[in-house]
């Protein structure tokens, strides 16, 4: 019987979405043995592309849109496909395991990371926010280029929870002292100076989102509200006096007369968005329309906001607290990390009838940060309190077994913290708080181990 299976052949039509890897020779329809596996099909594609051992590319193989993880024969049997059919076989560059490149030590937990790249090759800058209340800028060699000054808040160390680059010379950070701060960064002078304080929240700020072209900033808070600010002080109204520290209330009035000791101007919000009933964990601008925003909350809901009218236009209710959020524009989906240890992909469009399109399982604790692969529309990175960053390919899915959860996927790679015993990855001191995926730098993450860690695929 094994001999018969090995001799069975099937027609395949090879295709790729990568124009640089098109097979120019005819025919594109081939007759191959059904005993072939992904590895052998990858070898076949390299031969058709005339790539030798030194230039060989590892390929993943998809049949009818599903990854091949067995022989073709087993795939046909599992999916009830007749061997007389012509199979559409797509080949795509395999996701190479991201190796640990380096890590940068901090004095306290690293709550957030962001990357500034695309300015000039070799001039990438990494932004980190820490529980010591400071933001730092690093180069990719691990040198601290600049550290922010301690905020003027009575000497209290107020932990930061979030930080984003707004431009080459501006960044935004916020945390447990309820305020959002805009900083000016000078790469030549190696200084980070607080330029503006934005005041509207009564409790800590969990997340910020920025839209550089409009200078707009969104902040999500534990007080259940979302605020909209401008990074230009003059565009914002006067800060609410009842939310200003007593030492700042008077100085706020004197900001135009500030002396060299620099009184930092404080301003209020352009708008406040209410509607969540529990802390708001994450907020983002819609990628193709900055007049729309999405927010995720511990109240289990994902909300869509029309910013010009300060109106909630849609609410999607899930079964768990939502801890993180990112957009996947190519699929018109939003990825949400949950307290239930999985990632739920949601279609936010009003026409969508199903809340959960896909569920990704593999973490052992809450999923608190998400980012997409800038080089692929299919890949996603997630950071969790279980001490890992996991890499997902959204094509690596199967039919879900639970009603209402859509397709189900498993991670393709797991990144552990450098120097950690992987058998104790989700123990004390291992939580990962933030992840960013950058085309030039790689996968950057920060966590409870007081490190910024960089992982990158070999050769990238």
From Swiss-Prot:
Biased composition regions of type Low complexity, renumbered to the chain: 239-252
Record-annotated disulphide pairs: none
Keywords, in A-Z order: Nucleus, Repeat, Ribosome biogenesis, rRNA processing, WD repeat
Subcellular location: Nucleus, Nucleolus; Nucleus, Nucleoplasm
Region feature Ubiquitin-like (UBL) domain, mapped onto this chain: 10-93
Subunit-structure text: Component of the NOP7 complex, composed of erb1, nop7 and ytm1. The complex is held together by erb1, which interacts with nop7 via its N-terminal domain and with ytm1 via a high-affinity interaction between the seven-bladed beta-propeller domains of the 2 proteins. The NOP7 complex associates with the 66S pre-ribosome. Interacts (via UBL domain) with mdn1 (via VWFA/MIDAS domain).
Protein name: Ribosome biogenesis protein ytm1
Organism for this UniProt entry: Pyrenophora tritici-repentis (strain Pt-1C-BFP)
């Amino acid at each position: 019987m094994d001999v018969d299976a090995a001799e069975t052949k099937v027609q395949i039509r090879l295709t790729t979405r990568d124009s640089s890897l098109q097979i120019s020779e005819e025919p594109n329809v081939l007759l191959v043995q059904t005993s072939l596996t992904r590895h052998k099909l990858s070898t076949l594609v390299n031969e058709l592309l005339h790539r030798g051992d030194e230039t060989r590319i590892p390929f993943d193989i998809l049949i009818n849109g599903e990854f091949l993880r067995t022989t073709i024969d087993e795939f046909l049997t599992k999916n009830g496909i007749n061997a007389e059919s012509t199979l559409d076989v797509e080949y795509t560059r395999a996701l190479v395991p991201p190796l640990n490149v380096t890590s940068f030590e901090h004095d306290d937990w690293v709550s957030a990371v962001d990357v500034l790249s695309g300015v000039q090759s070799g001039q990438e800058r990494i932004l980190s926010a820490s529980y010591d209340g400071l933001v730092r800028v690093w180069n990719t060699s691990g040198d601290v280029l600049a550290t922010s000054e301690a905020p003027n808040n009575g000497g209290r160390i107020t932990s930061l929870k979030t930080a984003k680059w707004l431009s080459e010379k501006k960044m935004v950070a916020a945390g447990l002292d309820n305020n959002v701060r805009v900083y000016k960064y000078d790469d030549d002078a190696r200084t980070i100076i607080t330029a503006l304080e934005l005041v509207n929240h009564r409790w800590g700020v969990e997340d910020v989102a920025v839209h550089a072209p409009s200078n707009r900033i969104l902040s999500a808070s534990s007080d259940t509200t979302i605020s909209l600010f401008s990074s230009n002080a003059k565009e914002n109204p006067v800060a609410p006096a009842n939310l200003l520290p007593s030492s700042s209330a008077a100085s706020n009035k004197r900001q135009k007369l500030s002396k060299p000791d620099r009184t930092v101007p404080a301003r209020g919000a352009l708008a406040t968005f209410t509607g969540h009933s529990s802390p708001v964990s994450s907020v983002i601008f819609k990628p193709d329309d900055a007049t729309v925003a999405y927010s995720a909350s511990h109240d289990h809901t994902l909300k869509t906001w029309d910013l010009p009218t300060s109106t909630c236009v849609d609410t999607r209710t899930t079964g768990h607290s939502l801890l993180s959020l990112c957009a996947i524009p190519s699929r018109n989906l939003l990825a949400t990390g949950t307290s239930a240890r999985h990632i739920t992909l949601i279609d936010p469009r009003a026409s969508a009838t199903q809340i959960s399109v896909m569920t990704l399982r593999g973490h052992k604790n809450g999923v608190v940060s998400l980012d997409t692969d800038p080089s692929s529309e299919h890949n996603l990175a997630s950071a969790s309190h279980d001490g890992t960053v996991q890499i997902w390919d959204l094509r690596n899915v199967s039919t879900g077994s639970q009603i209402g959860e859509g397709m189900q996927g498993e991670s393709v790679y797991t990144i552990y913290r450098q120097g950690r015993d992987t058998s104790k990855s989700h123990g004390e001191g291992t939580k990962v708080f933030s992840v960013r995926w950058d085309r030039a730098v790689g996968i950057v993450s920060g966590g409870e181990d007081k490190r910024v860690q960089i992982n990158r695929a070999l050769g990238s």
